[in-house]
A protein has these predicted regions:
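Alpha-helical transmembrane segments of integral membrane proteins
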Residues: 124-338
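Gly/Trp-centered helix-boundary motif
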Residues: 1-154, 158, 162-163, 271, ...
Length: 338
């Protein structure tokens, strides 16, 4: 079934497509995101496909014991080790991913940190882990985390702004005073304190950051509801007996979403930046997790290895620039003056 767009939506889509920088940024961001989603197929220390003595194996999807390849241990083997390399070379063959390291694999054959080489394209960090593999996995984690935080904070912010703007009065007054006080709190310091009190984890970190990120959209949605509740079609719907929930989410919210959508790419930027800052300070993801903030810290601590700081700088600058360009293009496309 084809999606039929209204003339207004077609005009906005055409305006976005006419913005060459925004269109190119969206394509690059989607390509980067899709690539990171399949990180295990790009950077892994296990073969994608393995044939051994006439049997087929998928080590990237399933754990096989060493005994399946003539070994003695009932644990998964080191496919890059000497034992498996000799077995594969003699009795089979393997299809490897382009990068033969995952985010936690250590290259013991080279001193750490090691400069870029044919084996480690962007070098290794101070623990001997492949930098490019950690960048790919870290990008996926950062983007997925930012998307989850943006969606959750947008949902809370839209609901809070809708209630304040629709009902007004004491509800709006109390809500505004609370948001003013809450927004005035030193967010980064409180995030550090709260993150240090709980066990490090993605879920806890997402919940803690959600406490302070939901206020970003409240004022925008509130203003749209304050304006929309006095429009004629809303009064007509109220006269016909439509309830408050139907009025808010069926009639006023679609118009309020126009202003909300223009903020989403910038909220993604803020989420990525905050997560990177917390990881850099050591209060973010669990130790050992592939993260951009941890790479920033390694670049600071290993100035003799410039490839660490340069790599994470280019990655962060590229990611944030793409999101900003997308946000500017969306904002211009929804601008009624264009």
């Amino acid at each position: 079934m084809a999606i039929v767009l209204s003339p207004l939506h077609r005009r906005r889509l055409a305006a976005f497509r006419a913005n060459r920088r925004g269109r190119l940024a969206l394509r690059l961001f989607l390509a980067l995101f899709v690539t990171c989603l399949f990180a295990e197929l790009i950077a892994n220390d296990r073969p994608l496909l393995l044939e051994y003595r006439g049997q087929w194996f998928l080590p990237v999807l399933r754990d096989y014991p060493e005994t399946a390849f003539g070994g003695e241990l009932p644990f998964p083997p080191d496919y890059r080790g000497r034992f498996m390399s000799e077995r594969i070379a003699r009795d089979g063959w393997a299809l490897w991913p382009p990068i033969r390291f995952d985010a936690r694999s250590i290259n013991y054959a080279r001193p750490a940190p090691a400069p870029p080489s044919a084996e480690n394209w962007l070098g290794t960090d101070d623990q001997g882990r492949d930098v490019l593999a950690r960048v790919i996995y870290g990008l996926r984690l950062s983007i997925l985390f930012a998307l989850g935080l943006t969606l959750a904070s947008s949902l809370l912010g839209i609901c809070a702004g809708a209630v304040q703007g629709y009902y007004g009065g004491w509800i709006d007054l109390f809500g505004q005073r609370f948001i003013e006080v809450w927004s005035g709190l030193p967010m980064l310091y409180l995030l550090i304190i709260l993150a240090s009190l709980v066990q490090p984890g993605v879920g806890w970190l997402l919940a803690i950051m959600l406490l302070f990120s939901w206020t970003s959209l409240v004022d925008v949605v509130r203003a749209e509801f304050l304006r929309g509740r006095h429009l004629e079609y809303v009064k007509a719907a109220r006269t016909l007996g439509l309830g408050d929930a139907g009025m808010m989410f069926r009639h006023i919210l679609p118009n309020a979403m126009v202003a909300t959508l223009t903020f989403l790419p910038f909220l993604l930027c803020g989420a990525v930046t905050t997560l990177t800052a917390l990881d850099f300070l050591g209060f973010g993801l669990p130790p050992g997790s592939p993260s951009l903030g941890e790479l920033v810290g390694q670049g600071r601590d290993n100035l003799q290895a410039p490839w660490l700081g340069l790599t994470v700088f280019v990655v962060l600058a590229t990611l944030l620039s793409l999101l900003v360009f997308i946000g500017e293009a969306v904002r211009d496309a929804f601008d009624p003056r264009t």
